[in-house]
Amino acid sequence: MFLTLDTSTLTLSLALVEREAAEPSEPGGGLRTVEHVVVGPPQKQSEILPGVVGELLARHGVKLAELEGLAVGLGPGSFTGLRIGLATVKSLAYAAGLKVAGASSLAALALEGPEDVPLYVLAVARKDDLYLGAYLRRGGTVEALEPETAMSPQEVAARMAAEPRAVALGPALVDYRAALESHGVAAHRLLPGHAFPSAVELSRLVRFPEERSLQALFAMEPHYVRASEPERNPKFPPLPGPAPSARLKED
């Protein structure tokens, strides 16, 4: 049994999942959702996340240390949300001696799309840009067609014009559907729903390492795609000499 969470949007998705298949490495299969918890605004993830995790485990009589591991959506998405989710997973895993695993939040959304057509999964980025992940879904697996990126709505529309079979889905369509249609994307190619990455679908993508590794735990980073605001506009100029080997993620 393991716990999966995604905080890449303002909506927290948290799932307690157990394995049913004899072969745990079976792609996306053999999993049963014990409970899926969804908590949206106005509640703040930084304030509620530890309590929601504790309450979920308590409802099913499961202790944190009894879990196989903890899994988290790595984005791209909200910089603050990603930091909250990953910090929570790292601290809980370190305290309880658990394995950790992560997967793309956009790929989890692609698992909810139709099969055998290019899927452009869209999430809101900063500066009126959109994160775009291009995938092909086959059953319980997804294939990335190219690296995830960020671009303007107009550029997304141009990409869809160049790939007439592609359809778009994802949380960005809540706010940017009209903008994409104004740039020529037909309404039927913008799929409804899919307002946040589901921890249930994310659970089908994660693969835990065979052994727990502190190095892997501390090395896990969110997939920001683009630099966060503090990295683009540092408060202080860089010091002379070689660049530091570690980057600060704090605002």
Walk through the language-model features, giving the residues of each.
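Glycine-rich phosphate-binding loop signature in dinucleotide/nucleotide-binding domains
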Residues: 60-64, 115, 160-164, 210-212
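DPxDG-like acidic metal-binding loop motif
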Residues: 69-100
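Glycine-rich phosphate-binding/hydrolytic loop that grips phosphoryl groups
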Residues: 192-224
